[in-house]
């Protein structure tokens, strides 16, 4: 038969309890079924045959109850009741199940349930909220990265200074070619100079053309023409037409004569500005004949 006073005298005062933690001010209990976490007579789960507590498992709250009738059966010592997710309905369930329990246990169960629900709500909020992940770095790696950053910054500043200096020299025509350095910047500078020189040349040409046109005289036709002038022009056109017909007849007759001469003579001589006329030369041939007497003696 279980006696709560004997158990408390044994565990609480005289002998050792594995769940007890003593400090300078107070003693605490590490038992998982402890209602308050304090080591005292009313809160001890081992020295109270009628006891109740609240536990949380995987985000769900349960009410655990112990009575003296099941003290002889350790396998069925605790009765578990699942509480509702709604806070008010869960409190009603606690009141219904702990109606014959001491008021202290009932009040502490409600207090424990409120604390558990509060930290569950906080856990849900933290999981939904985006958090920073802190990654530990060794001091060696940190120093190495800092040195690399400083070296890269110094190298970038040097490159910019060298580029500016070389661009200024190129603009001042200090030297013609650039060696051992990226030439992209110089190509850009040369393109800008060429574009500026082309625009200045075009402007100078336009100015010269405008100066040349100054004082130039031109003749422009008049739109108003008298009728007498028109009749004179018509007579001139008739005369020009008759003269053109005569010239066409003459040219056709000359072409026919040329074709006949070409047939008789053969090939036509070459025409061109480089051809020279040959001088007229008369050639005479003389034949000598020996006398007949000389021929007989021989």
Swiss-Prot record:
GO CC entries: nucleolus; preribosome, large subunit precursor
Subcellular location: Nucleus, Nucleolus
Sites of Phosphoserine modification: 197, 200, 228, 231
Pfam families per UniProt: Mak16, Ribosomal_L28e
Keywords noted in UniProt: Acetylation, Isopeptide bond, Nucleus, Phosphoprotein, Ubl conjugation
Region (Disordered): 190-276
Protein family (similarity comment): Belongs to the MAK16 family.
Classification via Gene3D superfamilies: 3.30.390.110
Keyword Cell cycle among record annotations: no
Main location: nucleus
Composition-biased stretches (Basic and acidic residues): 249-263
Biased composition range(s): Basic residues: 264-276
InterPro entries (alphabetical): Mak16, Ribosomal_eL28/Mak16
Protein name: Protein MAK16 homolog
Compositional bias ranges of the Acidic residues kind: 193-213, 220-235
UniProt cross-link Glycyl lysine isopeptide (Lys-Gly) (interchain with G-Cter in SUMO2), position: 55, 151
Residue list for modification N-acetylmethionine: 1
Highest taxon listed in the record's lineage: Eukaryota
One GO BP: maturation of LSU-rRNA
